[in-house]
Amino acid sequence: GVDKDLRDLADEFASHGYIAAAPDLFWRTIPGPLTRADGELTSKRSQPRAEKIKTGEADLTDTLAELRKLADFNGRAAVMGFCYSGPYSIIGPKRLGYAAGISCHGSRMQDYIGELEGVTAPVCIIWGDDDNQAPPEVLDAYRAVANRMSNVELHIFPGIKHAYMMPDAGAAYDVKTRQFSMARTLAILNDLRGGGERLRKAS
């Protein structure tokens, strides 16, 4: 849900001069933020997972439509996904009209690796190798894709756990990996804002 960590991230992007939107993908079931102690509710509202991810595509399409109404929007948006929403980093550029995708500690990404076929926009995927939602075989599969697709960049950090981006994640939170992830995201956004070299190659 859209908790303080996500609102703070949106504010951080805004402080760099970017338009930021954080849609609540769970508004149809159990809306709003949940605490990390609400494990049962968190699981319940995201199931059945494939169906919920598919339904959320409409929310991302609607979000992009709203952005296009803004005078300051240049027509290029990136989708950034964490945990449950990691797959949108692929789905967004694949078929929803987004110009780039970034996933930080995405979950169940093995179900969406085939969606990368035909994607030419920049996709950046970042994990820790101690992420319980990204087993070694998933990391290896994405390594293979990144090795053959120049628009896909993959970063895997040793000892980093799931939810490393989120200060509320307790011991899993990692400042340095978060800083790296933000730096890479801002670099991609800068390309989208100015039509940088990577964007021209992907067009």
Segments (PLM) and residue ranges:
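N-terminal cap/leader regions of alpha/beta-hydrolase-fold enzymes
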Residues: G1-S203
